[in-house]
């Protein structure tokens, strides 16, 4: 019998973890009824939870869990702890909670390397909400003696979500801001880190999960264009790029995220140590080929 894992958010990263770990017996939530129907058709015990309503069977499924993985971001309405704190407390076999957070909580570090001991200097509304959620889940685990792991994640790419597909759709831009780099990780590497956390039995703690090479975003687009044999979009200076507020926010802070702790203590080794290996593998799998 496999590990019973309840996922708050059966989305992109959770799906990769489930595919990578056949021993998991998954159940969990999705926001839309249509997505829940798809998951159930695929044999996954899925329930609707969108912060305002939930399926009646969700609470019973949650109480059977041996581990909980939380990948939904803080948003308006009731979050999992607002609605299900009592059910989580009543889960007799629950031994671990894994919360997917963001490296955005570190905020501005002048382009320097940050590890898990670095100050969390975020001033953005999203980052502060994430920090508050980290604290709430950590406290929920502490009061029950349950290990809580915080996985701080960078930009996620993988099948269907990558620079190759952006080029195919005509959406790729090469925005250049001097000395700016982006931290990223392939979704399969995130899934592997989460699998290790669930299986190693270490005390709950914070983990940075990222590849080995933070890189300028314009270089990533250029590499993808080279794989596809198409011209790279022209470079655009950040100062005159007319980005949306959301897109511009990703250029607001400078840091390089270290994965050294996960390598040393979890035995985490990225299968895709940089965007080059990740994009090359995606290209070989057929991503973006209709350009």
Predicted regions and their residues:
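A conserved pocket-lining segment of Rossmann-fold NAD(P)-dependent short-chain dehydrogenase/reductase
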Residues: 165-185, 189
